[in-house]
Amino acid sequence: MIVYIANPLYDAVFKRIMEEERIAKTFLSAILQREVVSIKICQDGFRNIKSNSISIFKMGFVASIKNNGNSNELTNIRLYKTWVDTDVLEPRQHLAWQRYIEEKNSDGIGDESLPTITVFLLAHHIGDFETPVACPAPGNIIVQLPIISKTQNSSQKKVLSIFDQARTCREDKHLLKVDYTPYDGDTDMEYM
């Protein structure tokens, strides 16, 4: 069955879906490859950051994440999403830019005493990175949406498939044309 969904690459759509706790837990569990037990958007936990040609949407969360010892650990999650192709050539430059933003825009998102995981969702390919989901430094995850189909991880691939811009409707780029069949029976994906 083919369905049309709002394109989550757009900030308003992405913000709306990530405000749903169940969707945020499903999405972040797939990215982090760890179970997110509970999640809360931080007060003032989203904003659009614009600097020259870079436009980034930022959300902050505090999450309880199941660790390897099967106990829960509170963690800050900072999620940055950009749909504009930036002149970021290397992940190190992107991470340096992120640190600059955090220093300049101390926004009080999250609890600074907690460990922080930063996730970058990029709607473009950067540098020579051929890995769709990469961890170039501890606590940093880069997701390159244009090459997500190359991921070998089925849960990441399924969740991130909702960003597949190859599904964009020709008539309206704000909509994606999605074959619902692969999600049949997966209650989290059906909800998403």
Where do the PLM segments sit?
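Elongated, amphipathic alpha-helical interaction scaffolds
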Residues: 1-192
